[in-house]
Regions:
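Beta-strand scaffold of nucleotide-dependent catalytic cores
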Residues: 38-42
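Alpha-helical support elements that line or immediately flank enzyme active sites
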Residues: 48-63
């Protein structure tokens, strides 16, 4: 996976867990002037969840937070070349973590507790 690991100087962090399958993702963003300069992630889960989070980091680096927020799990799955139907939910956790990080950035907090 690309861009895997914690980012010490992230100014926006989103964390999401899926209680149904046990997967969890933390997305770390370094945002300057509403542009995502750097992004890393930590995903604990199946290979499809890790691959989806990894490709998502490649897709959003250099984009505005608005452009990144609009990305869909379908776009992530397409970028991977498709996912089996029963694994489509795995592409959602990275998107949700990214959106939570962007929401935290917009709200002026690095990480929220909800």
């Amino acid at each position: 996976p690309r861009n895997q690991g914690e980012m010490a100087d992230a100014n926006a962090i989103g964390e999401v867990s899926n209680p149904d399958c046990g997967d969890s993702t933390v997305m770390y963003l370094k945002v300057e002037n509403d542009i995502i300069q750097d992004v890393t992630f930590e995903t604990f889960g199946c290979a499809a969840a890790v691959a989806s989070s990894s490709i998502l980091t490649e897709m959003i680096k250099g984009k505005t937070v608005e452009e990144a927020y609009k990305l869909t799990e379908e776009a992530v799955a397409d970028e991977l070349g498709g996912l089996p139907e029963k694994k489509l939910h795995c592409s959602v956790i990275g998107i949700e973590a990214m959106r939570k990080a962007i929401a935290n950035y917009r709200n002026g907090v690095v990480r929220s507790d909800d």
